[in-house]
Amino acid sequence: LDEVVNPLGLRWFKFDSEKGFFLNGKGRKLIGTARHQDYFQKGNALRDELHVQDVLLLKEMGGNYLRVSHYPQDPVIMEMCDKLGIVTSVEIPVVNAVTETEEFLHNSVEMAKEMVRQDFNRPSVMIWGYMNEIFLRRPYTEGKQLEDYYRFTEKVARALEATIREEDPSRYTMMAYHNMPQYYEDAHLTEIPMIQGWNLYQGWYEPDINEFQRLLDRAHKVYKGKVLMVTEYGPGVDPRVHSYQPERFDFSQEYGLVYHKHYLNEMMKRPFVAGSSLWNLNDFYSESRVDAVPHVNNKGVVGLNREKKDVYWFYKTALSRRPILVIGNREWKSRGGVVNTAQKECIQSVPVFSNAEEVELFVNNKSLGKKKIEDNYALFDVPFVGGENLLEAVAVTGDNKLRDMLRIQFQLVGSQLKDEAVPFTEL
């Protein structure tokens, strides 16, 4: 005997090119992440509990959408999204380029059929995806070869669109483009799917972060009637790296906050942006990468071993309905710095994340005063002394008094070697 147990979920949904996403008649901005099934020292071979942990991390963050990318993943991922009410899109691995053969076309169509039939009964699935950045690695740049390549890619796309709509007319289709809209327009790919997904990295791979919102507005104007989602965005963030003058490609926690704050604010301003999936839930192995950590793409809001970065707390504070108070830089518990005050202290900034209106920070039982929360966090200039420093944050939301504490060991270095108050001990 063989047995299949299917979940039952009753819901109705729709996408609108002007007003975004609606679930059971209520407007919902989809905010979430993409995800690779990758883990520290384990690669892709994960036990069920690690898959479960990832979906719980997304739920805890306040995310309501998971882009299962760029391939169907373990069934336990889908099971958890069904149980936790997380909207999902699932896609087949047709990524970066096509092979101009009928065998490639046939295989792609078969993958699309298998994907839909595998997860057809999943109530969490509302989008089927089938191409990601398909012109990122074009083998040709001009002439007849490029024209033929475009024509074949369009043929594959239309075959996949038709296949998915025939297999499942109740759900939406989506294709994810990269930041070269002209390529996709020339091949007519912007016309085909029901949802346009845009992978945008202005302020990271592209220099001007403000080009992000200009591209959103252009897409909304040019592709009238098309639903728009931001399917990828995000900078690399190494939790070991900090900067008090954050800038593009420094991989600092601080630039990660600057970037994500800008993107989230711009997307929330625009009701026509139906949703977004930041890249990525977790850091993941990528052999060709030569970033802050070799062979690792560290755009995740959590690390390979799932330690939470500051950008995770930023999103949790922005998206959660529960009262939140968290002192940031939690992994940076052993610090050092040069004396920069007359009181023989070293001032360094520390973010405090909260959805309260204001927060008060105490350092070694001395108040640094209260600060208004702006864009989900307040930044305090903390005067560290040598040795152990106790940070305590206090905030009030309604009837809830919130507290968070963090102990930091600080190595104070004199501004001059002859400073008797801060004796020189090490290089």
Task: List PLM regions with ranges.
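Non-catalytic C-terminal accessory domains or segments of carbohydrate-active enzymes
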Residues: 393, 404-427
